[in-house]
């Protein structure tokens, strides 16, 4: 039985909710085929985010870690391909930090690739008619910071990890101009995503690239 740790960020940037946290809370204790989900709430704070998830990993000893965050402007669930060693925050985090062009980890490598089967994930969600596509940038805010930091922590461990961005909820789109996804569909998608990771020790060879 695989243990799947799924994490979600608290609200930030003036929002009262974060779909990542709302979705993972619904998945707490969910039984999968060959696995079970446990969850962790993550502060949107530069240093505490990594420490919080590392502590959860040490507590739960998971086989798989899936970190989740919201991405305004995206219409699909987007597993991230790569984390980069750059903090360049457009807005302050919830602790008031706003680094500019600073490394996530001093003397760390330029980037880490996900160890989740992102092509298998997109295939599984497409079969369920849930919008999903591979993303090649996790940004330079706390999402990328956490993605990079946890990949660095797990670099010599057998635990698989990757970051997934999800769309806003309809109630977050006050202007009516942003793409959104219902919480029910996000929850369904994340459950299928976790199952795809359990089912695929290695990724499948299908195209998911972009021209630019």
UniProtKB/Swiss-Prot annotation:
Recorded catalytic reaction(s): these are: Release of an N-terminal pyroglutamyl group from a polypeptide, the second amino acid generally not being Pro
State the UniProt keywords alphabetically.
Answer: Cytoplasm, Hydrolase, Protease, Thiol protease
Instruction: Give the CC-aspect GO terms.
Output: cytosol
Q: Where in the cell is it found?
A: Cytoplasm
GO terms for biological process? proteolysis
Give the enzyme's main class according to its UniProt record, as a single word.
Answer: hydrolase
| CDD domains noted in UniProt | Peptidase_C15
State the family it belongs to.
Belongs to the peptidase C15 family.
- Explain the purpose of this protein: Removes 5-oxoproline from various penultimate amino acid residues except L-proline.
The protein's name is Pyrrolidone-carboxylate peptidase
Give the originating organism: Vibrio campbellii (strain ATCC BAA-1116)
At the highest ranks, the source species' classification is: Bacteria, Pseudomonadati, Pseudomonadota, Gammaproteobacteria, Vibrionales
Which gene is transcribed and translated to give this protein?
pcp
